[in-house]
């Protein structure tokens, strides 16, 4: 529990500032990149012998001009408070929290094969009509679906896959045999 509380405080602070300076999406990308750099060089960043300023300078150098003063201060704060081990969770939580702050909705779409841009647009329009929010689609591939899709959003699951229909038919057949 403490783990998510720590992450959420950093996320909420960065979201608040990001909203004021209109950089919510930019900070999300920077956090994702920071997470990648942290995971790759974890031993360096977790080494207590390396000074905080050196860690922050290393990040600034690796990001180049894409990093602004606000984000540098955020990173400095994370390292000064020795919270760098939470960077992956901060990045993950920020992604979901930023979707909510921007009045969007996360939509998980699982299909047997990659969807075309036209199919994605159709799903996006359908979800937008249902919940009146801009969808952020997260695609997953599951070949066991055979064909069709499973769409999950706002606590709802719409299964229009072949395997889903076959499972439904099987349940109905077995319920008839029992009765």
From Swiss-Prot:
Q: A GO molecular function for this record?
A: proton-transporting ATP synthase activity, rotational mechanism
The record's subcellular location field reads: Cell inner membrane
The UniProt entry, under Pfam families, shows:
OSCP (PF00213)
Give the matching InterPro entries.
ATP_synth_OSCP/delta_N_sf, ATPase_OSCP/dsu
Q: Which UniProt keywords apply?
A: ATP synthesis, Cell inner membrane, Cell membrane, CF(1), Hydrogen ion transport, Ion transport, Membrane, Transport
How does the entry describe its membrane topology?
A: Peripheral membrane protein
Q: Which family does it belong to?
A: Belongs to the ATPase delta chain family.
Q: Subunit arrangement?
A: F-type ATPases have 2 components, F(1) - the catalytic core - and F(0) - the membrane proton channel. F(1) has five subunits: alpha(3), beta(3), gamma(1), delta(1), epsilon(1). F(0) has three main subunits: a(1), b(2) and c(10-14). The alpha and beta chains form an alternating ring which encloses part of the gamma chain. F(1) is attached to F(0) by a central stalk formed by the gamma and epsilon chains, while a peripheral stalk is formed by the delta and b chains.
Name of the molecule in the record = ATP synthase subunit delta
Species this protein is from: Thermosipho melanesiensis (strain DSM 12029 / CIP 104789 / BI429)
